[in-house]
């Protein structure tokens, strides 16, 4: 009977969210039933989480798109965009992941998680055949990691780890010296969608 009681379903979702149990089958069932009865941004996001757990990433994107059409506050909007960007990254669609992470930053420019995600997307970009230029994406990725820790100190540890990981792949000074498109110390614009 409670599967048709929107108030009970909402209470269940609220309780499980407060307890940090949004990965439980009970939470998913409540979100799915609530979404069927009376769709809200919260129920759509709950259904998206269920899809992610089942690795139904296309379904998760669709539910996040629904959530975004119903959301009534900027904080949740930015969070849904961030989560949707993560889904695109899980799908290895880094270009779309970066685009959605940028949309999240347009809503909340202080969310360091989005800059970390942008950096990961850029580091995963395959935009050059040239082996030296292909590594130029790591410069931009590390710029994003630095930006993450500059705007959001809670991201500092993750940002520092990512910088340490990806900076080791920068083109060497010798590579830069011998490459006609690069000059040490000069600005360089990474092409493609990055």
Regions found by a protein language model. Name each.
Residues 11-16, 30, 47, 67, ...:
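Structural register within alpha-helical repeat arrays
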Residues 1-13, 24-27, 36-46, 75-81, ...:
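Generic helix N-cap/helix-start motif at coil->alpha-helix transitions
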Residues 1-3, 31-40, 66-74, 103-108:
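Solenoid-like repeat scaffolds
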Residues 17-21, 72-75, 89-92, 119, ...:
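Short coil/turn linking the two alpha-helices of tandem helical-hairpin repeats
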Residues 147-194:
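Terminal, low-structured helical/coil segments at or just beyond the last alpha-helical repeat
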């Amino acid at each position: 009977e409670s599967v048709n009681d929107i108030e009970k379903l909402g209470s269940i979702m609220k309780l499980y969210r407060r307890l940090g149990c949004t990965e439980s089958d009970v939470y998913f069932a409540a979100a799915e039933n609530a979404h069927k009865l009376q769709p809200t941004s919260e129920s759509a996001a709950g259904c998206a989480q269920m899809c992610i757990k089942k690795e139904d990433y296309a379904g998760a994107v669709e539910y996040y798109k629904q959530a975004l059409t119903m959301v009534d506050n900027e904080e949740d909007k930015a969070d849904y965009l961030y989560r949707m960007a993560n889904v695109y990254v899980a799908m290895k669609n880094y270009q779309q992941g970066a685009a959605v992470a940028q949309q999240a930053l347009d809503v909340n420019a202080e969310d360091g998680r989005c800059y970390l995600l942008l950096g990961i997307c850029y580091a995963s970009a395959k935009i050059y055949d040239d082996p030296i230029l292909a590594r130029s994406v790591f410069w931009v990725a590390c710029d994003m990691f630095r930006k993450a820790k500059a705007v959001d100190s809670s991201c500092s540890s993750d940002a520092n780890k990512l910088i340490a990981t990806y900076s080791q792949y920068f083109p060497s000074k010798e590579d830069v010296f011998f490459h006609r498109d690069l000059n040490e110390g000069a600005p360089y614009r990474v092409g493609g969608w990055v």
